[in-house]
UniProtKB/Swiss-Prot annotation:
<comment type="similarity">
    <text>Belongs to the UPF0250 family.</text>
</comment>
<dbReference type="InterPro" id="IPR007454">
    <property type="entry name" value="UPF0250_YbeD-like"/>
</dbReference>
<protein>
    <recommendedName>
        <fullName>UPF0250 protein VC_0945</fullName>
    </recommendedName>
</protein>
<dbReference type="InterPro" id="IPR027471">
    <property type="entry name" value="YbeD-like_sf"/>
</dbReference>
<dbReference type="GO" id="GO:0005829">
    <property type="term" value="C:cytosol"/>
</dbReference>
<dbReference type="Pfam" id="PF04359">
    <property type="entry name" value="DUF493"/>
</dbReference>
Length: 92
C-alpha cells in the first residue's frame, strides 16, 4: 500500500485543494461501487458518479472516482480505508 507520509514526491506534486482520482479494483460484486462511495462520503462528502469498468474475464471491476481533495492526510486515509474493504484487491 502507498504510504504518502514517506513519499515526499507525491506530496510535492500535489497542491491542495485539487482533484484526485482513486481507482479501486475489486471482485465483480454489485455492491463494490456502493461500498467505495460509502468510504469516500465519510471523508470527502459530495455528489460522485463512479465509473465502473469490468476486467477482460469479468471477474473483477475497477471503480474510478474523482474527489476534491483538501489535504494529503485526506488522500492517505482514503487509500487506507478503501484498501480495507474486504472485496477490494488494490487501490491506485
Amino acid at each position: 500500500m502507498l504510504n504518502i507520509n514517506s513519499d515526499a514526491k507525491l506530496k510535492d506534486l500535489l497542491e491542495f485543494p485539487c482533484s484526485f482520482t482513486y481507482k479501486v479494483m475489486g471482485h465483480a460484486k454489485p455492491e463494490l461501487p456502493e461500498r467505495v462511495l460509502e468510504v469516500i462520503q465519510r471523508h470527502a462528502p459530495g455528489d460522485y458518479s463512479p465509473r465502473v469498468k469490468p476486467s477482460a474475464k469479468g471477474n473483477y471491476h475497477s471503480v474510478s472516482v474523482t474527489i476534491h481533495a483538501t489535504s494529503i492526510e485526506q488522500v492517505e486515509i482514503l487509500y487506507k480505508e478503501l484498501g480495507e474493504i474486504d472485496i477490494v484487491r488494490m487501490v491506485l
